[in-house]
Amino acid sequence: MSSLLCLVAHPDDETILCGGTLALLSARGVDVHVIALTRGEGGELGEPPLTDRENLGQVREREMVCAVGKLGGKSLTFLGYVDPTVGEGGELSAPAHDPAMLSGQIIASIKQTGAQVLLTHGSNGEYGHPAHKLMHAAALIAAASLGGAAPLVYSFAASYENHPYPRLSNADDPADVLVDVSNFIDQQLAAALCHVTQNALFVRRRSQEAGRPFTVREALLMEESFHRQWPSHITHDLFLDWVSKK
């Protein structure tokens, strides 16, 4: 049995950063398990607001259940950490946590799912989000603790020349694997539209940069990029086999 574990900080990260690859692998028979650090309680409420701050976590949980289903995910687990609200000046932060406990939860999830490959955030936290960096660090601590029993660890949003959205890529993580996900754009779009409270966020910056309204579909990547984080040297790359299989 082939099994992959995707670790993300917030609902919608799984769709925007690697949703096409999750859909592709699910279609190829890989069991895709998704774990979210938080329920995104600190995120946007929608434009116009679709809920209030008190209920946003529950709303976003339902949105993520919808999205993971559209991507063909086998399971979705929330670790239960609380996402801090964005500061008045736009400051982002990670949730309160115990590092050893978090890494222990990840180790337990790896063992429970039998994951052979783990996908998570990059070393720069994509656009520098502290919660993304936290998940990256915790995943590597878990892998180091497991040693030879650890899955391959890949980070998404790796950097490469002419990346269409360089702000979302990790400058310190050069791409080792590029995955053409254009055949799965409809599934990824369906998943993105599940995250209705965040749809305005998906297109806001790109609409401003383009000087015209962007659609959610236009904001999605047709090619997703990954950097191998663990181990540094391997003789056989199972993840590459999965994404390259015809």
Regions found by a protein language model. Give the residues of each.
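Active-site rim/loop-helix segments in enzyme catalytic domains that contact anionic ligands
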Residues: M1-T113, I141-S145, W242
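Metal-dependent de-N-acetylase/amidase catalytic core
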Residues: S2-L5, G90-K246
